[in-house]
Amino acid sequence: MSLSNKCFFFVSKSSSGMRSTSSSPPSMSNLAYWYVAKILSERILRISALLMYTLMEAFLIRNSPSISFNTASGGIEGEKFGREHIIVINIYIYIYIYTSTLQLCV
């Protein structure tokens, strides 16, 4: 059983010839292997998503636009304006990571 097969439904035939589907492995001997594969795939997904998140955050902070409004009332600081946009983007990335983790078979 490979990591990619963990979300597939297992098909088994009963003695009467009827096919039944279940989302659990057919034998108890494969249960530990199936569980370890599930945990490892979740860890790999979270680590890769965290790496993508960190790289994108570093890229956005480094290349954030310096916008300043020179008004008599003080205006908005350039870095603060750029970082607020980065925070919104980070929230979207976090939601993407969370929903992609929920899509795994439980």
Swiss-Prot record:
Top-rank taxon, per record:
Eukaryota
Extra remark beyond the main annotation = Partially overlaps DAP2.
Official protein name in the record: Putative uncharacterized protein YHR028W-A
